[in-house]
């Protein structure tokens, strides 16, 4: 099992404190890995800064070829990556193989092509006797911090556009789920020039702070919690670094009287509980119009209670464990707080399961009120609440009454209503009669405290570039 760091094209052991990496399905230690020392963080950043002088001047074609080689290598090692991700995260193995690995490969291939397609304002004589042109140039060294819920996929979302644009990257995966990023490092060292891609391991306070605060780091990209985002913004503010933040969500799912209730119930079953609900876009905050509220509660109760929890390697498993014991405790506390409210009905689930591993039963909480914490705060687990609403204006007001602004969905057969709401919902993405669907060609990102900046799409590539004006007098 690959446990070494990648610094300047060489795999090396960490020189810092050793950290245990767990299998959340069993609670057992998989292995111990040594963190990067401050000196190693410095070496990785300096290697990236040195490599940038040449990598930043390579042609888009050359960068695309490297990304395509990495995509091919991931595809060729798909089963090994899937097993590592499943073991380290508790994800059902078949979900990683069938859903995540193909999407990861596609992201690298998309940005390989996108690197060759950047466009801008036409060059011309906007001032007599002077020709102006626009350049989109790479930024420099990018520090990327990946989360623990989709370790390899989020690494791909960060690495692909940054490298495609000509930046050099130092990436730190979560200390909870580092295995696939470290495996990726072993493949990347033979594809990219030394220093272009560096992979470190360690905790935020010991490695992340040193990395993001380094004077040679020009941009920090984070997918994580609001509190982590706030910390990084405060930490990097004195240096005025560019930042790219994706900080979670609490997606409203608005179901009107005319919606296909079977489709909505199946949608919540799938999109609210995929990855054990550990997803920023999870369909977790349901609003049902009064006329169909009771019927939808019943359908959702049946749908959610039918989800099969089990071992990640079992092909029939739909729901795996939460990522860590600490997170299991957070989810349990959030649900217990909700259950203490007299108006909350627990339709199914509501507690962690007995036995080994960090499993929490798929949970549906009915009759939640707009002001309840279970409606307002991100739980990031297999927990869905449902609230009754009366009309379009009320539900729009409630849906937007949130500090989050990442994803939302509207379920209705009324095309006009779908357009009205999608235009007024304060979310980076709104799906109509579906949820959770992502493609490499379309942007993913939020507003409000869900952050700013886009992943995927040409917009994501542009986020990793600088716009410069060149004027020639003649």
From Swiss-Prot:
Pfam families, per the entry: Aldedh (PF00171)
Residues binding NAD(+): 146-148, 172-175, 209, 225-228, 280
GO molecular function: aminobutyraldehyde dehydrogenase (NAD+) activity; NAD binding
Entry keyword annotation includes NAD: yes
Superkingdom of origin: Bacteria
Pathway: Amine and polyamine degradation; putrescine degradation; 4-aminobutanoate from 4-aminobutanal: step 1/1; Amino-acid degradation
Catalytically driven reaction(s): 4-aminobutanal + NAD(+) + H2O = 4-aminobutanoate + NADH + 2 H(+); 5-aminopentanal + NAD(+) + H2O = 5-aminopentanoate + NADH + 2 H(+)
PANTHER family given in the database record: ALDEHYDE DEHYDROGENASE-RELATED
Further information: 4-aminobutanal can spontaneously cyclize to 1-pyrroline, and 5-aminopentanal to 1-piperideine.
Family membership: Belongs to the aldehyde dehydrogenase family. Gamma-aminobutyraldehyde dehydrogenase subfamily.
Purpose of the protein: Catalyzes the oxidation 4-aminobutanal (gamma-aminobutyraldehyde) to 4-aminobutanoate (gamma-aminobutyrate or GABA). This is the second step in one of two pathways for putrescine degradation, where putrescine is converted into 4-aminobutanoate via 4-aminobutanal. Also functions as a 5-aminopentanal dehydrogenase in a a L-lysine degradation pathway to succinate that proceeds via cadaverine, glutarate and L-2-hydroxyglutarate.
Protein name: Gamma-aminobutyraldehyde dehydrogenase
């Amino acid at each position: 099992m690959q446990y070494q760091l990648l610094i300047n094209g060489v795999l090396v052991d960490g020189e810092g404190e050793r950290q245990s990496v767990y299998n959340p399905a069993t609670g057992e230690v998989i292995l111990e890995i040594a963190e990067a020392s401050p000196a190693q963080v410095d070496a990785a950043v300096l290697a990236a800064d040195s490599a940038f002088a040449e990598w930043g001047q390579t042609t888009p074609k050359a960068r695309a070829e490297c990304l395509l080689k990495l995509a091919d290598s991931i595809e060729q090692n798909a089963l090994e990556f899937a097993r590592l991700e499943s073991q380290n995260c508790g994800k059902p193995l078949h979900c990683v193989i069938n859903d995540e690995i193909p999407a990861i490969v596609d992201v690298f291939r998309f940005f390989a092509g996108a690197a060759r397609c950047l466009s801008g304002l036409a060059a011309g004589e906007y001032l007599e006797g002077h020709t102006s042109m626009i350049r989109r140039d790479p930024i420099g060294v990018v520090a990327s911090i990946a989360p623990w819920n989709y370790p390899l996929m989020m690494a791909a979302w960060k690495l692909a556009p940054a490298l495609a644009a000509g930046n050099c990257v130092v990436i730190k995966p979560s200390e909870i789920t580092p295995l696939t990023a470290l495996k990726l490092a072993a493949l990347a060292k033979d594809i990219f020039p030394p220093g272009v891609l560096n992979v470190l391991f360690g905790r935020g306070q010991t490695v992340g702070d040193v990395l993001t605060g380094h004077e040679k780091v020009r941009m920090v990209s984070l997918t994580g919690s609001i509190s982590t985002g706030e910390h990084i913004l405060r930490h990097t503010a004195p240096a005025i670094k560019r930042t790219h933040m994706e900080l979670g969500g609490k997606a409203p799912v608005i179901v009107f009287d005319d919606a296909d209730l079977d489709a909505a119930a199946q949608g919540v079953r799938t999109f609210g509980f995929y990855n054990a609900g550990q997803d920023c876009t999870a369909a977790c905050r349901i609003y049902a119009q009064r006329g169909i509220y009771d019927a939808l509660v019943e359908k959702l109760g049946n749908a959610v209670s039918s989800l099969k929890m089990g071992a990640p390697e079992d092909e029939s498993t739909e729901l795996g464990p939460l990522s860590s014991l600490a997170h299991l405790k957070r989810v349990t506390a959030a649900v217990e707080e909700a259950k203490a409210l007299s108006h909350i009905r627990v339709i199914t689930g509501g507690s962690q399961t007995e036995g080994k591993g960090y499993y929490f039963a798929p949970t549906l909480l009915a009759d939640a009120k707009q002001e309840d914490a279970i409606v307002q705060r991100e739980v990031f687990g297999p927990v869905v609440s449902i609230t009754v609403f009366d009309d379009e204006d009320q539900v729009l007001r409630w849906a937007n009454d949130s500090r989050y602004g990442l994803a939302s969905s509207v379920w209705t057969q009324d095309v006009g209503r779908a357009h009205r709401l999608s235009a007024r919902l304060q979310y980076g993405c709104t799906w109509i009669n579906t949820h959770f669907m992502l493609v490499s060609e379309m942007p993913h990102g939020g507003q409000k405290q869900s952050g700013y900046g886009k992943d995927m799409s040409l917009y994501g590539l542009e986020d990793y570039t600088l716009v410069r004006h060149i004027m020639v007098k003649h």
